[in-house]
UniProtKB/Swiss-Prot annotation:
Protein name: 7,8-didemethyl-8-hydroxy-5-deazariboflavin synthase
Broad class of enzyme this protein falls into: lyase
Origin superkingdom: Archaea
Listed pathway(s): Cofactor biosynthesis; coenzyme F0 biosynthesis
Gene3D superfamilies named among the record's database cross-references: Aldolase class I (3.20.20.70)
SUPFAM superfamilies in the record: Radical SAM enzymes
Length: 328
């Protein structure tokens, strides 16, 4: 059972999507954008606590918001991709390995960011276009599954180690859940770059449009984890531990083999009501189910090679984290 010791750095809460289950986005984020000195202060703090991963997550097409655009221009950047590249570059030089999830972006942006990222990510959430007509995604053009599937495929063409996953309980049917797994299996069979699939349960929060939506049951989640593991024996299956503190052991027995990024320094800004468990607590939960807990990097060991990583990232891993490299 693995985990990555990380810091979560939300560069901005501005986002073009208005998902019915989200508390992260803001029309007027304050500050509109984290500045480099703030980011690097967090990076240095993370390094002092033994973190290896910097998770850069922020709203999709954030540079379309006037406040963000003005701040980018004042810093000398044209858009969020250019700015993220710069921050990833600084972070990599400092000794943390970047993992970026900035919503749907194109092939050119992916190719650019691969140079300074150990891995990247985008949740598929669901392959069902029907959800675009529901409260979950009615006001979220970036949640169109066609766009998200294309980005995951583009990452495969570029040989980027990739994390994706499904969001369970946002109005999808059992059949649509199965179709979503089959879509990811099709992509993986063609490109082989998916390192991890997250099976994440919807959690109701006060004040969101979907506040009264029923959360998925434990049995539903167990079935999804088991189905994912059967369909993806070559991919790690993650269940977020902070969203399932009381039931974590059950998911291990169902086939989950990764806890994802766990931070000793930052909260989960997407689910602020659910703090990360301490590493010692994760160890206890894991061992109580009969498994050992092992730390990993944001790129899984089998993807640590020049086939999947840029020379720049590979050299940093060889220099700083040789113990994580697969030895033959």
């Amino acid at each position: 059972m693995t985990y990555s010791r990380n810091i979560f750095i939300p560069l901005t809460r501005a986002c073009r999507n208005r998902c019915g289950y989200c508390t992260f986005r803001s029309d007027t984020p304050e500050p509109p954008l984290l500045e480099p000195e703030d980011v690097m202060g967090e990076v240095r703090r993370a390094l002092s606590l033994g973190c290896t991963e910097a998770l850069f997550t922020f709203g999709e097409d954030a540079h379309e918001f006037p406040g963000v655009r003005d701040k980018l221009e004042s810093l000398g950047f044209g858009d969020m991709t250019d700015y993220t590249y710069h921050l990833c570059e600084l972070t990599l030089d400092a000794g943390l390995l970047p993992h970026t999830n900035m919503g749907v972006i194109g092939y050119r942006e992916l190719r650019m960011l691969k140079e300074v990222n150990a891995s990247m990510g985008l949740m598929l959430e669901s392959a069902s276009p029907r959800l675009m007509e529901t409260e979950a995604h009615r006001e979220s053009p970036g949640k169109n599954p066609r766009l998200r599937i294309k980005m995951i495929e583009d990452a495969g063409r570029l040989r980027i180690p990739f994390t994706t996953g499904l969001l369970i309980g946002i109005g999808e049917t059992i059949e649509e859940r199965a179709e979503s797994l089959l879509e990811l299996r099709r992509i993986q069979d063609r490109y082989g770059h998916i390192q991890e699939i997250i099976i994440q349960n919807f959690r109701s929060k006060p004040g969101i449009p979907m506040e009264n939506q029923r959360e998925p049951s434990l049995l539903e989640m167990v079935k999804m984890v088991a189905a994912a593991k059967i369909m993806f024996p070559d991919v790690s299956i993650q269940v977020p531990p902070n969203l399932n503190r009381e039931t974590g052991e059950i998911f291990l027995l169902a086939g989950a083999d990764d806890w994802g990024g766990v931070s000793p320094i930052s909260r989960d800004y997407v689910n602020p009501e659910a703090p990360w468990p301490e590493i010692d607590e994760l160890k206890r939960i894991t061992e109580s189910a009969g498994f050992a807990l092992e730390e990993r990097l944001p790129v899984y060991r089998k993807f640590i090679s020049r086939e999947f990583l840029s020379p720049r990232v590979m050299e940093r891993i060889e220099e700083l984290y040789p113990r994580f490299i697969e030895t033959l």
